[in-house]
Amino acid sequence: MTLMDGRAIAAQIKLEITKEVQQIVINGEKKPHLAAILVGHDCSSETYVANKVKTCEELGFQSTLIRYESDLIENKLLATVEKLNQDSNIDGFIIQLPLPKHISEQKVIEAIDYKKDVDGFHPVNAGRMAIGLPCFVPATPAGILELLKRYKITTAGKHCVVLGRSNIVGKPIANLLMRKAYPGDCTVTVCHSRTKNILKHCLEADIIIAAMGVPEFLKGNMVKDGVVVIDVGTTRVLSTETDSGFKLRGDVRFKEVAPKCSYISPVPGGVGPMTIISLMRNTLLARKKVIYS
């Protein structure tokens, strides 16, 4: 069993991005600039945004954090989005989800200029990805692809089971793994909360992407020997073992599943670091206008 070390791979990509940023500066050009909007005080969102800002600093990016209280009205947020759309100094920006319930996430996402949508959530980017055109790929699916690529996992002709159908992970990674490129050319089965015989599907899988958001959903009796398992789950659970009083738990019961795997990603330290670095790479692509001129 090989542990897929997302931290180590992300560190390699950091070096690659840092060199590109240094060259941009040497050429007398503007550093990549990522902005983030955070509404409210959700603990997970606070942590994620702090990590993104920290990574920007490490890479030599410029970053801007815009904070609002949870009682922010929708129109004010939409006005901020439009301001960022028009700001030529901002290469890309994200809106940290989830938003308070009184704000329509879809309406806000659709208000973003798709050329600055480095999260890859805008319908234009989602549609272009679906038909194989250049676009900003959502960060978590992009990170998963990079793990498969860096560990040289064979995907062509393999049966991949995706557990979960969210717009952020499940649907896009299923689409990407079907594309005519590496990593891809998989036969993909998407399972979700209404799927019958999930056990049967999982036992037939060569690759499993676990993104249900259910702690330890995938157990040892659900996988065959030699399977590749990528755990996307990051549920915060109470714990007396940590100073913070909680720990992250993945969608895979690691101790049972890992011995049967050829490759497996851990939680934490697997997909998480890859997600953040993939967002940074999207920001660099936006700065260089590689995808959209």
UniProtKB/Swiss-Prot annotation:
Residues binding NADP(+): G164, R165, S166, S193, T234
Function summary: Catalyzes the oxidation of 5,10-methylenetetrahydrofolate to 5,10-methenyltetrahydrofolate and then the hydrolysis of 5,10-methenyltetrahydrofolate to 10-formyltetrahydrofolate.
Domain of life: Bacteria
Subunit structure: Homodimer.
Organism: Azobacteroides pseudotrichonymphae genomovar. CFP2
Protein name per its UniProtKB record: Bifunctional protein FolD
Pfam family, one: THF_DHG_CYH_C
Keyword Thylakoid: no
HAMAP family: THF_DHG_CYH
GO biological process: L-histidine biosynthetic process; methionine biosynthetic process; purine nucleotide biosynthetic process; tetrahydrofolate interconversion
An example Gene Ontology molecular-function term: methenyltetrahydrofolate cyclohydrolase activity
One cellular component term from this protein's GO annotations in UniProt: cytosol
EC number: 1.5.1.5, 3.5.4.9
Entries under InterPro entries matching the protein: Aminoacid_DH-like_N_sf, NAD(P)-bd_dom_sf, THF_DH/CycHdrlase, THF_DH/CycHdrlase_cat_dom, THF_DH/CycHdrlase_CS, THF_DH/CycHdrlase_NAD-bd_dom
Pathway the protein takes part in: One-carbon metabolism; tetrahydrofolate interconversion
Protein family: Belongs to the tetrahydrofolate dehydrogenase/cyclohydrolase family.
Catalyzed reactions per annotation: (6R)-5,10-methylene-5,6,7,8-tetrahydrofolate + NADP(+) = (6R)-5,10-methenyltetrahydrofolate + NADPH; (6R)-5,10-methenyltetrahydrofolate + H2O = (6R)-10-formyltetrahydrofolate + H(+)
Keywords from the UniProt entry: Amino-acid biosynthesis, Histidine biosynthesis, Hydrolase, Methionine biosynthesis, Multifunctional enzyme, NADP, One-carbon metabolism, Oxidoreductase, Purine biosynthesis
